[in-house]
């Protein structure tokens, strides 16, 4: 609390029980949570320190290596702790008893803290696992399946999401009268390889099943690989449903039906609740459950029409005429629907847009003029894509309007035509957004490639810093600080020498590590938002890098390349110095023997 009183803004730290980067690229489960957290800290004028653990180069199988405020063999130290924050968001599972003990000790001391995901005692934001598993099982039952296998997470996570989803599966099997057989349960540890091995175990168990529910999408992906290898056709021989609805699930073959978790919303809610704690409001330990939604694709056995209905949110339509809806009623319904899909817009923004859209829609219907509605929709689509959200999320708002169109006093054909045109506008916005992303990706890849080439050939630190200063600024990264640890007594990370990589002329700062970020580098009067990535030197734990918490998808590769370049420069410097000393020794030897 003392830090908040010394500054204008509260500082929120974020830690996870595993790494954010899979070697150099983001892990898709944490990414939307982090984006939700960042959006909320911007909305509520809070400082942010994101702990982004890094994978070990060349070891894509090592995924439990988080950025953590304590130095351990299975984590990398970053300065995000009770000494420089006002509260922490901790994302479960923690994967280590020592990490659980650490955060529970903070709770016992009264430090503000909230969890995302189940597994620890304390205030928690969780997905409604029971609702999600139940919807998956009922959907498979509707397809005629009576024997449904289950790929669970980790046996060590029975107090967390693994246990909650497994218990929900068992309860659903009993309630729906499905085949009960312990051989139908296997553990996949929520990773692709584990899912593949779990499916092999299920196939070899001798138990009969025609469908599978996986506890997450990575396990489902591995299960699909094993089924393909065994010659099983999906969904004709075995139907499969995942959990999480990660972006890559939509491009699998066949596309994966999955339970969608509103991860962005969970991150956003975590900030809201943590700020309540920081300001002195006590929170009970009762978890806040966020609703899930089954996203229908091909892997469950649904045909094209059902998938299209789900994509366009057309499945639920009223069957009886009621009183004409008001703008307030439409706003409420649209807000609830869009909120489930949004990944970059806050609730109050969504409500404002929905109110404007509902008002414009009713105005266009009443005046027989489509322009007010079309203009408002185009404006909303532009603002949505500018915030980095998906234009497609407004399809669900159009579905709400369509479901209510038959209650309007005007001829029904008129609002229907208006909404058909709205679908076309959204489609055009999606196409434009996709093209923009393709262009941006090519431009960024070109700059990252050039930077990589320069770092690979750099033999001294001056070349490294010059290359980074030029290309990071061009890529829109305006904050990039390199901190190298220095020891004091028995503390190897007590001090840091911090260099501003984007502004190399700025003097190197010598600062207490646990007081990061240095106050003298926070002078613009606005909240800071920083992502901290560990740097591992040849001895491990050399330091960390701090970036703007904006381009998280780029930062892992940049940090890894910089770490490798600095190590290369160090080795070159040591080799050059060794050669110089050897030459001096040879000269002395020659002079000695020439006498």
Identify the residue ranges that each predicted region occupies:
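Catalytic cores of nucleotide-enabled group-transfer and carboxylate-activating enzymes in metabolic
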Residues: 253, 257, 455-456, 477, ...
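Bacterial carbohydrate/catabolite-sensing allosteric modules
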Residues: 1-348, 352-368
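Heme-based O2/NO sensor domains and their adjacent alpha-helical segments
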Residues: 345-409, 497-502, 521-524
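Signal-transmission linkers at sensory-effector interfaces
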Residues: 308-336, 373-376, 411-461, 571, ...
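GAF sensory domains
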Residues: 380-388, 397, 473-560
């Amino acid at each position: 609390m003392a830090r908040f009183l010394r500054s204008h803004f509260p500082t929120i730290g974020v830690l996870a029980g595993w790494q954010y980067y899979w070697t150099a690229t983001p892990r898709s489960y944490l990414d939307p949570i982090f984006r939700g957290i960042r959006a909320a800290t911007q909305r509520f004028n809070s400082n942010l320190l994101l702990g982004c653990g890094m994978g070990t180069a060349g070891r894509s199988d090592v995924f439990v290596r988080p950025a953590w405020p304590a130095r351990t063999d299975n984590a990398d130290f970053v300065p995000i702790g009770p000494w420089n924050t006002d509260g922490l968001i901790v994302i479960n599972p923690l994967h280590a008893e020592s990490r659980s003990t650490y955060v529970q000790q903070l709770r016992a001391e009264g430090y503000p803290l909230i969890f995302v995901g189940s597994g620890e005692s304390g205030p928690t934001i969780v997905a409604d696992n029971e609702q999600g598993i139940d919807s998956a099982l009922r959907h498979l039952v509707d397809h005629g399946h009576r024997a449904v296998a289950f790929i669970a997470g980790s046996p060590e996570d029975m107090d967390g999401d693994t246990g909650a989803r497994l218990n929900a599966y068992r309860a659903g099997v009993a309630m729906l009268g499905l085949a009960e057989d312990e051989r139908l349960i296997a553990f996949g540890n929520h990773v692709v390889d584990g899912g593949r091995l779990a499916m092999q175990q299920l196939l070899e168990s001798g138990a009969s099943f025609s469908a599978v529910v996986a506890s997450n999408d990575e396990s489902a992906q591995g299960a699909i690989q094993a089924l393909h290898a065994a010659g099983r056709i999906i969904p004709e021989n075995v139907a499969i449903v995942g959990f999480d609805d990660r972006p890559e699930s939509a491009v699998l073959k066949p596309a994966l039906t999955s339970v969608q978790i509103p991860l962005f919303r969970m991150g956003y809610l975590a900030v809201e609740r943590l700020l309540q704690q920081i300001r002195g409001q006590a929170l009970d330990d009762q978890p806040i459950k966020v609703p899930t939604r089954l996203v229908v694709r091909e892997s469950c056995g649904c045909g094209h029409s059902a998938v299209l209905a789900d994509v366009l949110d057309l499945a639920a339509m009223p069957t009886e005429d009621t009183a004409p809806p008001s703008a307030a009623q439409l706003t409420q319904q649209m807000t609830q629907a869009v909120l489930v899909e949004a990944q970059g817009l806050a609730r109050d923004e969504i409500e404002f847009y929905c109110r404007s859209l509902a008002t414009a829609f009713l105005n266009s219907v009443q005046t027989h003029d489509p322009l007010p509605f079309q203009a408002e929709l185009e404006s909303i689509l532009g603002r949505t894509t500018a915030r980095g959200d998906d234009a497609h999320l407004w399809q669900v708002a159009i579905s709400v309007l369509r479901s209510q169109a038959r209650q309007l006093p005007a001829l029904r054909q008129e609002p229907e035509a208006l909404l058909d045109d709205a679908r076309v506008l959204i489609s055009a916005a999606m196409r434009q957004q996709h093209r923009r992303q393709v262009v941006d990706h090519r431009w960024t890849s070109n700059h990252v490639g050039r930077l990589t080439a320069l770092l690979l050939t750099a033999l001294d630190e001056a070349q490294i810093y010059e290359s980074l200063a030029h290309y990071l600024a061009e890529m829109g990264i305006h904050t990039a600080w390199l901190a190298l640890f220095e020891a004091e007594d028995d503390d190897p990370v007590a001090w840091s020498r911090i260099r501003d990589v984007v502004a190399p002329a700025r003097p190197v700062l010598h600062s207490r590590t646990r007081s990061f970020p240095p106050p003298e580098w926070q002078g613009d009067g606005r909240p800071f938002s920083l992502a901290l990535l560990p740097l591992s030197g040849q001895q491990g734990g050399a330091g960390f890098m701090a970036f703007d918490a904006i381009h998280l998808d780029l930062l892992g590769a940049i940090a890894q390349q910089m770490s490798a370049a600095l190590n290369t420069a160090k080795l070159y410097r040591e080799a050059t110095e060794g050669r110089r000393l050897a030459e001096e020794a040879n000269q002395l030897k020659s002079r000695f023997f020439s006498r």
